[in-house]
Regions:
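N-terminal active-site wall of soluble small-molecule enzyme domains
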Residues: 1-44
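Surface-exposed amphipathic alpha-helical tracts and adjacent flexible/coil segments at the periphery
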Residues: 1-3, 12, 27, 43-46, ...
Length: 242
């Protein structure tokens, strides 16, 4: 049905889905849920796909090493062209390593790897000392809820890492969110190539992004940060309310 509807490609992590899509002639993009973190894994999945979405836990230095190795070793996909690397640029982050969270599956029999995460990580939690039974005071009860990824203020470094596709969250988001985020990143990317990617413009774009749904922004792991940054509320920090 997807092929009949004219869908260009499917994002997949399950090997059976990947093989089925290839068999019926639908292009496959390898999902971040497969946790691709090195050139050897890229080589393997290059047998099935021309576009591979890397794990969200990599630094830009690691991303650049992979894109350079693709060029150096001429790693090609089914089309005969060099494999293209895609990374997440903006939106929600998982509290776990990409593709390795099973909280939703365990609690609700609803798998994140099948696009059905129940967002257990976005709830408030109480920390209990199991030996004494005492509750431990914590300054933020949203213990597993990461802030949203935002790469706009270092988008020049992202582009320079050699990626070909920037992935922006859209599923489950309102139309105003999608329109604002896509418009902002489109302007920023064009500005980079025009040589007008300035601090003043970045500040304006960041203000625009803050007007729509967000849990607060951070740079993810791209700039070498080892630990996550956590949201402090269950909803949006948007500067404009609907």
């Amino acid at each position: 049905k997807a092929k009949e509807a004219g869908i260009t490609a499917v994002i997949a992590s399950d090997q059976a889905v990947i093989m089925t899509a290839r068999t019926i002639g639908i292009e496959v993009h390898i999902s971040t849920q497969l946790n691709v973190t090195n050139i050897e894994t890229v080589k393997f999945y290059a047998m099935f796909a021309d576009t591979i979405v890397l794990s969200r836990e990599l630094s830009l230095r690691q991303v650049k090493k992979i894109t350079e190795d693709i060029e150096k070793e001429q790693v090609k996909g089914p089309s005969g062209n060099l494999v293209e690397i895609e990374i997440f640029g903006h939106g929600a982050l998982c509290m776990a390593v990409s593709g390795k969270c099973y909280l939703s599956l365990h609690s609700h029999n609803s798998s994140a790897n099948r696009g059905a995460c129940k967002q257990n990580c976005r709830k408030k939690y109480t920390v209990i000392d199991q030996e004494s039974g005492f509750e431990i005071e914590v300054d933020n009860e949203y213990l597993m809820s990461p802030k949203d990824l935002c790469t706009l203020d270092f988008l020049d470094q992202v582009i320079d890492s050699g990626i070909k596709v920037l992935k922006i969250e859209g599923r489950g988001r309102a139309a105003d969110y999608v329109a604002t985020v896509i418009k902002t990143y489109r302007e920023a990317i064009d500005s980079y190539y025009e040589g007008t990617f300035t601090k003043e413009k970045i500040n304006t774009w960041m203000e625009a992004l803050a007007t729509v749904y967000n849990r607060g922004f951070w740079s993810g792991y791209y700039l070498g940060q080892k630990l996550g940054e956590w949201s402090d509320n269950p909803g949006s920090n948007a500067t404009q309310k609907k």
